[in-house]
Amino acid sequence: SNPSSANVIAASPWANGFYGSPGVSGMLPAAYTLLGRRFLSSVQKAGLENQITLKEWRKGTVNTPDGWTYHAKGIWVTLKDEAGPSVSLIGSSNYTKRSYSLDLEANALIVTRDVGLMRRLKEEEEWLQEYATKVDQGTFEKTERRVGFHVRIAMWIVTLVGGAL
């Protein structure tokens, strides 16, 4: 048995910066919904649902008073009996061909034994968790989470052209 566990936090559709935007970009929150659903299916097929949890982050609704977008990216690793993460990967972790070709991407790997820094990293992780809610396949079956045919076709096209984007 593997005692390790992982929480994956993604933006809820209502915390996605493209929520409600006109045109093709407005399809992105639904596309991420479909990807989340597929991710959970893969977790279940691998028999890892007791070790890997998918959560969605939401603090209000974007473009409304007090609505926040979610764009946090990172990995926080806390070893057993530690005050907080001793390993953290932070940065602009976009790993697509487009990102490698056109964007400047940077990451930093932090490895620490400093208890104060570990506690601060833990506080950051806890703040993210505070606004994150566990999702399951039932979440994606709700009417407001249905992904339209046009989004599915667009994702299929993106898969075909792949790295050209």
What are these regions (language model features)?
Residues 1-165:
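PLD/PLD-like phosphodiesterase catalytic module centered on the HKD motif
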